[in-house]
Amino acid sequence: LFPYTTLFRSGYTDLLVNNRSQAPVQELEAAGAKGATQQEIGAQCDVVITMLPNSPQVKEVMLGKDGVAAHMKPGAVFIDCSSINPVASKEIYAELQKKDVEMLDAPVSGGEPKAIDGTLSFMVGGKQEIFDTYKPVLDAMGASTVRCGEVGAGNTTKLANQIIVACNIQALAEALTLAQKAGVDPELVFQAIKGGLAGSTVMNA
């Protein structure tokens, strides 16, 4: 729940929170947030934000039996910060539209450290006017918030991001293995090249 802790610190204090494990909920409750069921969140919140492991979990929480969506009011907005299949994002949005509920798919990059300090990067898909209205909410949790297109574009951009990250990791592994086999200390290679063109956030992670 790190992003939501940052959201709370930024002044969004009227928060209802839910999590599978209770320790993070209790931490936010101690700060002034209120623990709630999925059904209560759907019925009482104008904006619902999720960050879940994958597509099945998002669909279950939102669209499952007595899920959040069943209780959301017309005009409410769902912001999904999970990294899921773009097709699943579009499928969820199609169901939400039947209830006159809007959606932004807004996966993040940056990992736990950036979640803690509020410097995540958000890749967002959704209508321009919905993005413009709720961008301040995402800005409260991140350092970069970019609209990439309609719903599904956020998770498509996240896929592109992960391809680049994976290629960086593979190239870094091969380069440092080459250095080590040639008798050069990989740590010294890292120190020598991290400030040059080969340097990257992936390298420094």
What are the functions of these language-model segments?
Residues 28, 45-48, 58, 79, ...:
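Buried hydrophobic positions in well-ordered alpha/beta secondary-structure cores of metabolic enzymes
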Residues 9-31:
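NAD(P)-binding Rossmann-fold cofactor-contacting core
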Residues 38-103:
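Rossmann-fold NAD(P) dinucleotide-binding segment
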Residues 2-7:
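Short, small-residue-biased leader/transition segments that mark boundaries at the very start
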Residues 153-205:
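Helical "substrate-binding/catalytic lid" subdomain
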Residues 12-16, 46-48, 76, 120-121:
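Short active-site oxyanion
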